[in-house]
Amino acid sequence: MKRLYNCLMIGTVALTIVGCDLDMMPETTMTDAAFWKTENDLRGACNRFYQQMTGELGGFSHDYRSDELRGNSANSISDGSWTVPSTSGNWTNPYWRIFISNNILEKAERANVTDAIRNKYLAEARFFRAFHFFELVKKYGDIPMIMKAVDDTKDPALSMPRTPREQVIQQCYDDLDFAAEWLPDIDHVDTWGHVSRSAALAMLVRIGLYEGTYIKYHKLQGGDYKFHLKRAIDAADIMMHIDKKHKLYPDFQALFTYDGEGRQNQENVFVRVFGPNEAPVNTNNQTHGNSREMENTVTVTRNMVDLFLYTDGLPRDKSPLKLSHETCFNDVFENRDPRLAMTIYEKGEEAYKGAYTPFSFRNGYNLKKGFILKDWASLYAEAVDKMVIRYAEVLISYAESLYEYNGYITDQQLDETVNELRRRVKMPAMLTNAFVKEHGLDMLEEIRRERTVEFIDENKRYDDIIRWKIAEKVLPACLLGARLSTNDVEGGKVDELKKRITLNGGMFNGKKVCDEDSIYVLETAEDRRFDARKDYLYPIPLQEITLSGNNVTQNVGWY
């Protein structure tokens, strides 16, 4: 961690630095004596949060750690082959941002501004500190909670031991409560993409639900899961019933394109802003290669496709609308939740290089959600903004938190959460208590299902299976791809593909992996594992243990 300070201006904010070599101390053209005096100085200091975003706040990323997506090769976290790293940006990058926050929080007191102005920028710094502390807790559990600016690589703070996660999460709540009080409403944010009161409240929802369910299902000693769930419920209740600043965008498909950008889309809660729409790709515009990666790398697993309901509101193991046998690729879309056809490509749709042909790019289901054909065809890069938090997350998190807290949810609460998401896509069947009882469903499972299908490829699935403590069940299972039909695949590729498909009612290599023939097997269960004793937390990078003087201890089971 000490190497991070080679990237921080000792005694300054380093506003002139866009990037840095972690092994070099950058020169400074700005001293503390000349800074921290005006509102413009505070604004410039906080702008750094938006100039150098990483992790979930960075560009578009496709999370291959779970059973949701598969890339060109196996993911070491998903298949259980990961080992203890020497160093890792998963640790250092969040801490870097936390140290920037702490620097601002200490030195903003020098500025000759009103308390209201100062508190606005303190709130911004505290939002990002909470965001990154939570990012660390999700991965590592207990972490060193460093709450001061460090201007010396020998500062004792860099050797502090791990702080209990409960204490770190409480600090996140304190920071976000302050942020929610002092940040402007989203309607009055000066610069679009900067954090608002809504973003702070939504983070309270996210953290409260995560920590509450993590404590509940992992049975953490000393943790009060209901306390955290109540934090989520209360914050969501404010957003939904008091502030009322947000609503769902009417078009799910367009939500992830340029049409869904900006203030006019009230589903946007916190976005990572890139360049102007259809911006040329050059050094003056920030772009990303999301659509290009979707063509070259990303495939949605059959494991996820099977979770989509049929239009009667029933899952595939209960619905009479399920076809007895799929005869072609597009049969999987028959009578399904409309979001399925908005998430993956159907055969014949205009896609990467003309009409989409199954198995021509990947051996799973090719991701359609968020793909922008025009940018891919002309630029191989795009500038569409990334939604870090959207209002749909608040709605479904409210439903889940209510059920986990109370053990039940009312039809009215379902109607303003789960059923709002369904109405947006014109899903015929609504979720009610009577429907669940009549068909022998599990309400919690249906709420979780709704979250999963709504947020395919939005970096939710891995965190969800970790907090629900079902990773030990879903990650060691086969990863399945698309159904192979000789009518859908060109030429001689069929014989090669047939070596990896299920036969005789879902058998592969002598084991039953699903209930259908001709399903492509992306990864076998024999090639996947999950050790519940250790894999629910990341291993601490070895260098961080050494740099702390062994005060930071390794997570259980990692060596």
Where are these regions (language model features)?
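An aromatic- and glycine-enriched ligand-binding surface/loop that stacks and positions planar moieties
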Residues: 20-76, 143, 147, 177-178, ...
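Flexible, polar/acidic helix-loop-strand segments at domain edges
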Residues: 326-391, 558
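Acidic, serine/threonine/proline-rich low-complexity intrinsically disordered regions
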Residues: 149-150, 162, 214-233, 385, ...
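Conserved, well-structured interaction surfaces
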Residues: 39-54, 74-140, 156-170, 174-192, ...
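Bacterial Sec-dependent N-terminal signal peptides
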Residues: 1-27
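Long, intrinsically disordered, low-complexity segments
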Residues: 94-97, 171-173, 255-314, 381, ...
